[in-house]
UniProtKB/Swiss-Prot annotation:
It is an enzyme of class 4 (lyase). One of its GO terms (biological process) is amino acid metabolic process. NCBIfam families: PRK04180.1 (NF003215), pyridoxal 5'-phosphate synthase lyase subunit PdxS (TIGR00343). The lineage of its organism: Eukaryota, Viridiplantae, Streptophyta, Embryophyta, Tracheophyta. Pathway: Cofactor biosynthesis; pyridoxal 5'-phosphate biosynthesis. The keyword Lyase applies. The gene is PDX1. This is Pyridoxal 5'-phosphate synthase subunit PDX1. HAMAP family: PdxS. The keyword Repressor does not apply.
Length: 312
């Protein structure tokens, strides 16, 4: 488990560390994402839920028409949310508001930027718009969030301009197993990378199809060059604390809050669990009396669609 001091993220562009006198547009976006470090980002579908999330202590909300559990249950094509809904949620809260765009759908991202969204999540939870290309995130002023299952995928998204990385997990399932698998994969590769010499790093970068300079930066930092949040299946305070103890910088919570018996109480408990993730006594206290958790999905069922596998 990492200490708090080791969670400070250096700012990097393609040429190395950025100093105060040399601020690139990308470094500004990475800095905005760092402001969310140590926090909880909650999915909401209306202004009332957004207010509950803010009162519970969420650092940001994700504005959606349907939470991932409903996307799974209802099927169909999942697209960017109605801009009117996003505007209503923005008016209801003072914390940052995120919204999702389909992978590769740069026009959805342009619309979200035009209405003043704070962050865009290029998300595999929505139906793919382009199965070969992600959005060139350097073309936008606002920070982007992208998902990953492993280190190579994370660094490819950062090269495209992602200012925050999250584990993909399996959103809408209430099942943490895939998120744990993905964060352990990233952390394991970083531990191995730190002990490599330069020749080995070059070969390793090719093997994971990642940019060599970003692999070297990751080796030097001992972590990803941007903030790294957990997402996908976080449903309880214990789930949230687990992801923090595994080394994540914060947590996304989707269906796990507003598909539970007492959303307001569970939201507060998850925020407290992220803040006090290394204190079992506080974790035990905040886990009591939360009501029924979301039912969830057993991922051993072969009929379950894997959102995480929708893109590379």
């Amino acid at each position: 488990m990492e200490g708090e001091g080791s969670r400070v993220v250096a700012l990097y562009d393609g040429n190395g560390a950025i100093t105060e006198t040399k601020k690139s547009p990308f470094s500004v976006k990475v800095g905005l994402a760092q402001m969310l470090r140590g926090g909880v980002i909650m999915d909401v579908v209306n202004a009332d839920q957004a207010r509950i999330a803010e009162e519970a202590g969420a650092c940001a909300v994700m504005a959606l028409e349907r939470v991932p559990a409903d996307i799974r249950a209802q099927g169909g094509v999942a697209r960017m949310s109605d801009p009117q809904l996003i505007k209503e949620i923005k008016r209801a809260v003072t914390i940052p508001v995120m919204a999702k765009a389909r992978i590769g759908h740069f026009v959805e991202a342009q619309i979200l930027e035009a209405i003043g969204i704070d962050y865009v999540d290029e998300s595999e939870v929505l139906t793919l718009a382009d199965d070969a290309n992600h959005i060139n995130k350097h073309n936008f002023r606002i920070p982007f969030v992208c998902g990953c299952r492993n280190l190579g995928e994370a660094l490819r998204r950062i090269r495209e301009g992602a200012a925050m990385i999250r584990t993909k997990g399996e959103a809408g399932t209430g099942n943490i197993i895939e998120a744990v698998r993905h964060v352990r994969s990233v952390m394991s590769d970083i531990r191995v990378l730190r002990n490599m010499d330069d020749d080995e790093v070059f070969t390793f970068a090719k093997s994971i199809a990642a940019p060599y300079d970003l692999v070297m930066q990751t080796k030097q930092l001992g972590r990803l060059p941007v903030v790294h949040f957990a997402a996908g299946g976080v449903a309880t305070p214990a789930d949230a604390a687990l992801m923090m103890q595994l080394g994540c910088d914060g947590v996304f919570v989707g269906s796990g809050v507003f598909k539970s018996g007492d959303p307001a109480k569970r939201a507060r408990a998850i925020v407290q669990a992220v803040t006090h993730y290394s204190d079992p006594e506080i974790l035990a206290e905040v886990s009591c009396g939360l009501g029924e958790a979301m039912v969830g999905i057993n991922l051993s069922d072969t009929n379950v669609e894997r959102f995480a596998n929708r893109s590379e």
